[in-house]
């Protein structure tokens, strides 16, 4: 297979990935593949572009490194072109409502007829099967959080709150990425394709698993946070200093011992409630939990962030200042690792945003292209799979494809 023009880089060089989906979840999987060197083709509707394009800046990050194909994949010759593309595709990712592709005649079996080794990842809110009440419902970030038990655990004691920005979308996209790569590993061993059913609510069910395990095994559900503090453990979570906020984790025998000396609670060490060797203070079960919080709050409020960080570094207590976004660029760790970077958009502007992650030592990722325009690569992609200029123009004239003006 001849690949589309692009530099060769990263651990996934030579891999062809195609995705169909809008907004964040499915495309985030495509973004990861593209930044790790895969050739990634982004399918958009002919009449309506991906709704993410209305955002002024985010799409320049989320759609960089992609090849844009505008094709009606469910109708007539457009469907034929899509199935021909599948013959040269390693991984196909689609994000839709339940078994939307199967309902429109593009089943796993149809795809495997054209490519027996194809990895197919279906990403939806409620999965490819289940009850009629839920399976075909639309879902976005907050829907998946609410249905999974994740949202109810977040927020404050007075009110649950969804985790932003768009946590369920990003977790689900990463799940699609890792699951597709796991399937591809097996396909290369067996020669038999795989279909993956990724339900966003099940992804978030796993993300919310920590506290749920107590309830599922005969215990009580943990209460929500109070002002950003860990609902289980004292000395863990968000705290206010004299000049701003920090997060900290008071974990470890030595850390607790020395911290208690600083905040005036050394007399509690070695008591039945806080015996020698204590590594965590349970906020609820330990009767001194509220007192620990009261003393720690008072001590932190009397010190600046710099003073707290210096002292906690001496005690080996994990902590960090809560950074504002404007502080990120000048932070020395960000600068040293080039965590924020710049690239050129297709119209020649400079765009700034998060760099590629993670950092591969021997086969690093690369930003080689900005977000393509609607239908920008349609002609090149169709030519790549054997279509002539006349074939392409016929698809365009029938409204089944869009090429760049």
Curated annotation (Swiss-Prot):
GO terms for cellular component: cytoplasm. The active site is at residue 169. Its EC number is 2.8.3.21. Keywords: Cytoplasm, Transferase. One of its GO terms (molecular function) is L-carnitine CoA-transferase activity. It catalyses: crotonobetainyl-CoA + (R)-carnitine = crotonobetaine + (R)-carnitinyl-CoA; 4-(trimethylamino)butanoyl-CoA + (R)-carnitine = (R)-carnitinyl-CoA + 4-(trimethylamino)butanoate. SUPFAM superfamilies: CoA-transferase family III (CaiB/BaiF). GO terms for biological process: carnitine metabolic process. Pathway: Amine and polyamine metabolism; carnitine metabolism. InterPro entries: CoA-transferase_III, CoA-Trfase_CaiB, CoA-Trfase_fam_III, CoA-Trfase_III_dom3_sf, CoA-Trfase_III_dom_1_sf. It is found in: Cytoplasm. CoA binds at residues 97, 104. Homodimer. Catalyzes the reversible transfer of the CoA moiety from gamma-butyrobetainyl-CoA to L-carnitine to generate L-carnitinyl-CoA and gamma-butyrobetaine. Is also able to catalyze the reversible transfer of the CoA moiety from gamma-butyrobetainyl-CoA or L-carnitinyl-CoA to crotonobetaine to generate crotonobetainyl-CoA. PANTHER family: L-CARNITINE COA-TRANSFERASE, SUCCINYL-COA--D-CITRAMALATE COA-TRANSFERASE. Belongs to the CoA-transferase III family. CaiB subfamily. This is L-carnitine CoA-transferase.
């Amino acid at each position: 297979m001849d690949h589309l023009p692009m530099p060769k880089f990263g651990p996934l060089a030579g891999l062809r990935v195609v995705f169909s989906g809008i907004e964040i979840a499915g495309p985030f999987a495509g973004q990861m593949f593209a930044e790790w060197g895969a050739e990634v083709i982004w399918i958009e509707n002919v009449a309506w572009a991906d709704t993410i394009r209305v955002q002024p800046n985010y799409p320049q990050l989320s759609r960089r490194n992609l090849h844009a194909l505008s094709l009606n994949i469910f109708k007539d010759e457009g469907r034929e072109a899509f199935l021909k593309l599948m013959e040269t595709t390693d991984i196909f990712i689609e994000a839709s409502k339940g078994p939307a592709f199967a309902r429109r005649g593009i089943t796993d079996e149809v795809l495997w007829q054209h490519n027996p080794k194809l990895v197919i990842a279906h990403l939806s809110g409620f999965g490819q099967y289940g009850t009629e009440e839920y399976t075909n419902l639309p879902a976005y970030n907050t829907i998946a959080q609410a249905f999974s038990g994740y949202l109810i655990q977040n927020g404050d004691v007075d009110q649950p709150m969804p985790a932003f920005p768009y946590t369920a979308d990003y977790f689900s996209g990463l799940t699609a990425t890792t699951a597709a790569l796991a399937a591809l590993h097996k396909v290369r061993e067996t020669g038999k394709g795989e279909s993956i059913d990724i339900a966003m609510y099940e992804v978030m069910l796993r993300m919310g698993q920590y506290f749920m395990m107590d309830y599922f095994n005969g215990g009580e559900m943990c209460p929500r946070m109070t002002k950003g503090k860990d609902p289980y453990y004292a000395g863990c979570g968000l705290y206010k200093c004299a000049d701003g906020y920090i997060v900290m984790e008071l974990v470890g025998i030595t850390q607790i011992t020395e911290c208690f000396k600083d905040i005036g609670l050394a007399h509690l060490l070695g008591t039945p409630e806080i015996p020698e060797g204590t590594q965590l203070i349970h906020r609820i079960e330990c009767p001194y939990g509220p007192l620990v919080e009261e003393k720690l709050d008072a001590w932190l409020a009397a010190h600046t962030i710099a003073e707290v960080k210096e002292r906690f570094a001496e005690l080996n207590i994990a902590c960090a200042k809560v950074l504002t976004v404007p502080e990120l660029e000048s932070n020395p760790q960000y600068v040293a690792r080039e965590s924020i970077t710049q690239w050129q958009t297709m119209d020649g502007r400079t765009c700034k945003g998060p760099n590629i992650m993670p950092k591969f030592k021997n086969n690093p990722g690369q930003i080689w292209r900005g977000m393509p325009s609607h239908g920008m690569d349609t002609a090149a992609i169709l030519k790549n799979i054997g279509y002539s200029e006349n074939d392409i123009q016929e698809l365009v004239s029938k409204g089944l494809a869009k090429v760049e003006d």
